[in-house]
Every structure is written in C-alpha cells, then in structure tokens.
A protein has these predicted regions:
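A short Gly-Trp-Pro
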Residues: 1-10, 15-135
Length: 135
C-alpha cells in the first residue's frame, strides 16, 4: 500500500480551503496544451493528478465551467466563486481530477514533474528536452 501525505491549500481570497491526500511521490504535470494555456493565460500550468476521493472541498463555493476537450469528452473546470481562482479540473476522458499545484500551502512535496506538451502546442520559448508524456 502506498504511503499517503495530507496537505492543505486555498485560493487567493481564502474562501476555498481544501485538504488533499497525496501519494508520497505525487504525479505532477506541466501541461502545455492549448486548453490549459487559454484557461490561465500562461505558457503552461502545473497540476497534480489525484486519486478518486483524495480531495476534500466544499463544492458549494465553486463555480463550474463545462466544455468538450480535444477528445470530445467533457472537461469541468472548477473556480472560486469569489476570486475566480482556478482550483481543479475534472477530465472525463481519463476520469481524473487535476488540482492546480500552486494552491497548496506547502509545495515542498512537489519535487519532480513531467511535461505534457501535446507535441507542437508548447510555447517555443520553453525548450523541452523530453518528448512529453502521453496520458
């Protein structure tokens, strides 16, 4: 059985507070896809892939935006209703939750990450040595 580590986090205004049970070595991705870039206005986002039931959060304080992803399956983006900070996305294609890593109070556990760049969708200013992970 894998060791789990409990961490807490919040959005910038503090209305969204959560706790999350992470694997001892969490799966952390830097996603360079067009969808993630447009969602944040940044070159990529850093997310943590969560197991089902790992996130404890008051969903009543979240706003949800739904849209089809590149596969045609639904993506649900969850934001704070007050400050509009992105909190997590649920990707139907993989039945996974991806928590925005920057919301954690303590990021010390996040020691390694993999780039998901969907080949030619990353910014040319980011020199990516690996080909990217197919998930």
């Amino acid at each position: 059985m894998k060791k789990m580590i409990k961490r807490t986090g919040s959005c910038i205004c503090g209305q969204i507070k959560f706790s999350v049970n992470l694997d001892e070595v969490p799966r952390v991705y830097n996603c360079h896809c067009v969808d993630c870039r447009k969602k944040t206005g940044c070159g990529f986002i850093t997310v943590i892939e969560l197991r089902e039931g790992a996130l404890e959060i008051d969903k009543n304080k979240l706003a949800i935006y739904k849209h089809p992803g590149g596969s045609g399956k639904e993506i649900r983006k969850n934001f704070c209703k007050n400050c509009f900070a992105p909190v997590y996305s649920h990707v139907e294609r993989w039945q996974k939750i991806y928590l925005y890593a920057g919301l954690l109070d303590d990021v010390e556990i996040l020691k390694t990450s993999k780039n998901i760049n969907f080949e030619k969708s990353h910014f040319p200013i980011f020199e990516l040595k690996e080909k990217g992970v197919k998930i």
